UniProtKB/Swiss-Prot annotation:
HAMAP family: NagZ. It comes from Thioalkalivibrio sulfidiphilus (strain HL-EbGR7). Coiled coil: none annotated. It holds the Pfam family Glyco_hydro_3. This is Beta-hexosaminidase. Keywords: Cell cycle, Cell division, Cell shape, Cell wall biogenesis/degradation, Cytoplasm, Glycosidase, Hydrolase, Peptidoglycan synthesis. Its EC number is 3.2.1.52. It is found in: Cytoplasm. One of its GO terms (biological process) is peptidoglycan turnover. Belongs to the glycosyl hydrolase 3 family. NagZ subfamily. The record marks D179 as: Important for catalytic activity.
Length: 347
């Protein structure tokens, strides 16, 4: 059974029979984990083992584990700083900022790979315009060249640990005040003005970025649809103009920014038709079941091949990782850097 185009979430710290049934549906392809799914390192490792044993090829397992306000797993994991901390270090010393970003990318990815997570939806490529509260210090910097530089080094660290990177939120969520979890933001800037926000994505595509997540934001001077449902953005700009050949993941279809596209099956069909390879349905298992049953078309073979490249590689066991000099050095350096509050931001 090949990977399907739907990524689902779980209710708790162990699989229920209903979840087992949903995850073996031919249209299921992945699982996204949240803080509610984490109790301890041992529990998480066992949960991942169960998920991986459900089918072949194994389901993708993802998490939002950026650091700062967005870090799903806590006890036992390194407390990671917000991306803005690397931008601050970069402003003082470019080389140190780059090295810290690379080290944090490796540390985040190595710890997740050690428990069986395939990838994190990171790094954030949005610009720190000082407008968006939901982005805020999740962005590396206000300068697109600096964002691209730091994100490149962060991604290289992830890759060294055996993890593919997913940049978000194309073509840029940093220029709107509204939070797309709560409303449908509208960006009224001209295409020329948006170029600065797109630049980090363009650079990262050239550097070999494996995945991209579009924003549930309308860029009204370009297209009337939110970017995650827009063939203008996903096929015209991202695939054709930027030459992106990796995976396009929708943002969560349960967000308010997706409601304009109809019911959940309609949202999923619209996102896939526009160019997404996989759609996320979170916090509404009954709607996830509807989406799975509503997608009649066979998965796109090209999308299946893209998704297969998102599986993690080279994972060490937790003991092997924490015994390594590289982990001990990276953890000490990153712990000394971090001063951000750790809280759950529902993104």
């Amino acid at each position: 059974m090949s990977l399907g185009p739907v990524m689902l979430d779980l209710e708790g710290t162990a699989l229920t029979e209903t979840e087992r049934r949903l995850l073996t549906h031919p249209r299921a392809g992945g699982v996204i984990l949240f803080t509610r799914n984490f109790e301890s390192l041992g529990q998480l490792t066992e949960l991942l083992r169960e998920i991986h044993a459900l089918r072949t090829p194994r389901l993708l397992v993802a998490v939002d584990h950026e650091g700062g306000r967005v870090q799903r797993f806590r006890e036992g994991f390194t407390r990671l700083p917000a991306a803005a901390r690397f931008g601050e270090q970069y402003d003082r010393n470019h080389a140190r900022g780059r090295e810290l970003a690379r080290m944090a990318g490796w540390l985040m990815a190595a710890e997740l790979r050690a428990v069986g997570v395939d990838f994190s939806f990171a790094p954030v490529l949005d610009l720190a315009h000082g407008v968006s509260g939901v982005i805020g210090d999740r962005a590396f910097h206000r300068n697109p060249e600096v964002v691209a530089d730091l994100a490149h080094h962060y991604m290289s660290g992830m890759q060294h640990a055996g993890m593919a990177a997913v940049g978000k939120h194309f073509p840029g969520h940093g220029g709107v005040r509204e939070d797309s979890h709560l409303a449908l933001p509208v960006d009224r800037r001209t295409p020329a003005d948006l170029y600065t926000d797109i630049l980090p994505f363009e650079r990262m595509v050239r550097f070999g970025l494996a995945g991209i997540m579009p924003a549930h934001v309308v860029y009204e001077r370009c297209d009337p649809l939110p970017a995650g449902f827009s063939s203008y953005w996903l096929r015209g700009e991202l695939r054709d103009r930027l030459g992106f050949e990796g995976v396009i993941f929708s943002d969560d279809l349960s967000m308010a920014g997706a409601e304009c596209m109809g019911d959940y099956p309609d949202r999923a069909r619209a996102a896939l038709k526009a160019g997404c390879d996989m759609v996320l349905v979170c916090n509404h298992p009954e709607q996830a079941a509807r989406v799975l049953d509503a997608l009649d078309d066979e998965p796109d073979p090209v999308s299946i091949a893209r998704l297969a490249r998102m599986h993690g590689r080279k994972g060490m066991t937790w003991g092997e990782l924490t015994d390594s000099d590289e982990w001990q050095k990276a953890r000490a350096v990153i712990n000394a850097l971090d001063d951000s509050p750790l809280m759950e931001l529902d993104v």
